[in-house]
From Swiss-Prot:
It is found in: Cell inner membrane. Keywords: Cell inner membrane, Cell membrane, Membrane, Transmembrane, Transmembrane helix. This is UPF0266 membrane protein NT01EI_1718. GO terms for cellular component: plasma membrane. The chain crosses the membrane at residues 6-26, 46-63, 67-87. InterPro entries: DUF986. It is a multi-pass membrane protein. Belongs to the UPF0266 family.
Length: 156
């Protein structure tokens, strides 16, 4: 097994671990998911370039009669990348105490303000940063608004 094969295997394992965490573990962490909202996919061109480069590498490896194991690893990485970039939806998961955005848990107490922009972005102001959340379906913004009103923390 060459160094290239080891690197490809590491990337495949990391992609698969991320997919398992994102689809199976994160929805069960920190209590049950009360609301799940699909977000708009970003970086479509970047992911298409990545998958295209992998396809070129598979073609070159086959035409240069490279190792079959390397071809298999490249093809597997391409399939996993297609799943991660095109079949899986980025999501916003609302829990009892906070929400997951970008695989990071944010407690509701950290929210300082919320606004809705004209172009459909939900802007959430935190202590030190601002989140720009763009949902896949604009009707989801109404669901988020209703959910946050219902689960608003009462002052002590």
């Amino acid at each position: 097994m060459s160094l290239t094969d080891i690197a490809l295997l590491v990337f495949i394992v990391l992609f698969l671990l991320y997919a398992i965490y994102d689809e199976a573990i994160m929805p069960r962490q920190r209590s049950a998911t009360l609301l799940r909202v699909n977000l708009k996919r970003r970086n479509k061109a970047d992911s298409l370039i990545f998958i295209g480069l992998l396809a070129i590498l598979v073609y070159r490896n086959i035409s240069d009669q490279g190792a079959p194991f390397t071809t298999w690893l490249l093809a597997t990485l391409m399939v996993v990348a297609i799943y991660i970039f095109y079949l899986r939806w980025p999501k916003l998961l609302f829990k009892q105490q906070g929400f997951y955005y970008g695989n990071v848990f944010i407690d509701y107490a950290r929210i300082r303000g919320m606004n809705l922009s004209e172009d459909g972005f939900l802007v959430i102001d935190l202590e030190k940063r601002r989140l720009l959340i763009q949902v896949a379906n604009l009707d989801s913004l109404d669901e988020i608004f209703k959910f946050l009103l219902e689960h608003q923390q009462k002052p002590a």
